[in-house]
């Protein structure tokens, strides 16, 4: 648990959001929840080295998720934004989408991709979404989901059991 500290008292609930970090197989993931800007600033002040391969964020009610200073500290290889179609306030804004696009890393928005699942391996990870996006931790560029194996529609030859 990286945030909040026991004595933190922010007036907005989003600034007290729980922030978790884990290192799995040499890869680091950072879960920011709906952390607001004052909470992000406090986190950066306490822990300037927040480097993580994957960052998952929600959308705080006020201001935008993932300040530029926070992104500079994290240097993520993949960004997952947990947003939704409804209500409209839970959608990533065009301004946020544009700003994150400029980071030149894959950004996944759950309102478009559906659930994202990360499978950790000994020294790597693979991320898959319900929409068919697949990312490999060794080279996290968006990859199309491989086609399913072909199913034969031909009848199998009968087996004579005599």
Provide a role label for each language-model segment.
Residues 1-54, 62, 112-162:
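Core dinuclear metal-dependent hydrolase active-site scaffold
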Residues 42-117:
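Cap/insert and terminal regions of metallo-dependent hydrolase folds
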């Amino acid at each position: 648990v990286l945030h909040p500290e026991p004595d933190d008292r922010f007036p907005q609930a989003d600034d007290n959001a729980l922030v978790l970090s884990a290192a799995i197989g040499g890869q680091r993931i950072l879960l920011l929840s709906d952390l607001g800007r004052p909470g992000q600033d406090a986190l950066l002040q306490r822990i300037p080295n927040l480097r993580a391969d994957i960052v998952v964020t929600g959308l705080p009610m006020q201001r935008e998720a993932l300040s530029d200073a926070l992104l500079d500290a994290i240097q993520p290889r993949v960004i997952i934004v947990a947003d939704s179609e409804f209500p409209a306030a839970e959608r990533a804004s065009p301004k946020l989408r544009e700003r994150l696009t400029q980071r030149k890393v894959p950004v996944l928005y759950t309102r478009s991709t559906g659930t994202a699942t990360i499978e950790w391996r000994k020294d790597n990870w693979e991320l898959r979404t319900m929409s068919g996006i697949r990312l490999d931790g060794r080279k996290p560029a968006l990859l199309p989901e491989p086609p399913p194996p072909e199913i034969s529609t031909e009848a199998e030859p009968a087996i004579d059991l005599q």
